[in-house]
Amino acid sequence: MSSDPVAVITGAARGIGAATAARLAAAGWRLVLVDRAGDDPALPYRLATRADLDAVARACDGIAVVADVRDQPALTGAVGLAVDRFGGLDAAVAVAGGIAGGQVAWETDDAAWAAMLDVNVTVVWRLARAAVPALLQRPTPRQGRFVAVSSAGGTLGLPLLSGYSASKHAVVGFIRSLAAELGPYGVTANAVAPGSTETAMLDASAAVYGLASTEEFAGHHQLGRLVHADEVAALITWLCGPDSAAITGAVLPVDAGMTAS
């Protein structure tokens, strides 16, 4: 890894993305932080704001980029900014995503289904399209990293969230294929699979199931508690570093035991 490694993070304005930015910055990484920084009509909850993104960028001494991760030219531009400003790219971290549902699979309409695939898996592919060429520009022996956030819902079936669950399963398949393609170049691709994590997305999940509190999800975890965003960020940060060099194509749970049984 270079002395001043460089990463692009999507969904960086809050939650797991912001926590990852904080950890990577503390480890000496130079960062380009991408976020929509505005609400999305496809998602039933408020998203982060420009002020949120700017606050993360200031705290991390990173560069804030307001962009919709569904916009391929915007993502390519963010990666280009990292290369131009910092001299290259060592890691791409795909955190941006969303959750919506509330209907059984056969009553889910086309728009709702397509939205989940778009915001959860197509955006990971779009980041790979933008970032992998830059990762491969590093000289050999290179140690590039591509990390995506899947979900415990990417290994389990979740009622009333078929589109979300299908999209997160698709992230797993994509990452494993990407790992097979990148292996000969010395670049790894891995996914993390968080359980119920204390973020705004969990509030939306509670609404889907009619729960009075997100704490009710803790009963599905062997540890009896929710996952903290910083705990997911800790694993992402490790996957971006040199100690994870022999791991690729893996899906690593950070779920307090949600998928243990």
Regions found by a protein language model. Name each.
Residues 2-86, 100-101, 204:
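Short-chain dehydrogenase/reductase
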Residues 102, 156, 223-225, 237, ...:
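Short C-terminal tail/terminal secondary-structure segment
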Residues 103-105, 109-117, 217:
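Substrate-binding pocket helix/loop in short-chain dehydrogenase/reductase
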Residues 133, 180-184, 245:
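Alpha-helical segment proximal to the catalytic Tyr-Lys
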Residues 143, 183, 188, 247-249:
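Short, small/polar-rich loop/turn modules that mediate ligand/substrate recognition or access, typified
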Residues 128, 167, 175:
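Active-site helix of classical SDR
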Residues 151:
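Residue(s) in the substrate-gating loop at a strand-loop-helix junction
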